[in-house]
């Protein structure tokens, strides 16, 4: 409805969710038992009673599926670094079902990791961390240089403005529906936005104390890289499968059209 130009609200990006038929059919008490907390929160936020008027909603992404590579023991390619729950890729593929997040957190945290971490620790000898190693000094210098570079830009745009613009680009090009045209346009715009970020972002404060604006700027800088690789991956996967819906690959019934002959694999990108 939104894509067809029928959205509601100031930005024309919302739709109505009308419970009147369900209330008429099942009764308000039944709906209240099922959705009472949700309705109460909605009324508190909007000042509108969803039992009486349609709710105004907007579909939005919950998170991006996929994650860090882990082996059978849930250890990443960094020795000793275990990645559990939704942060890794192991228990889900191109789509998710309700409560999968809870399942993965319980399975990894309760059943797997207590055993695998113990086995790993039993084979190593704990020791003092040697911060005199050249790699430590190089990493510290890189982090400090990045902080100083962000603080030195002293531009005119806030970190949030870049974050919002990047989110809009990714949502429109690499959100619920994707197309070759949109993804190529995003892959042209994201590098431009990244250049604008590093030349015009304004980060108040200093790096000598806790600076949440600086912390946020570092995250948004990373988001620029993540957004680009997401769009590259979505463009490269020339099919529809799971939550990856390419509008060019649709059956006559409007369903996702897969291409298992060429894309029955998990993609891995190296940064």
Each language-model region and where it sits:
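Accessory "access/gating" subregions that flank catalytic or transport cores
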Residues: 29-75
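An anion/pyrophosphate-binding glycine-rich loop and adjacent beta-alpha core
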Residues: 1-44, 115-118
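Glycine- and aromatic-enriched mobile tails/lids
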Residues: 3-10, 14, 63, 69-83, ...
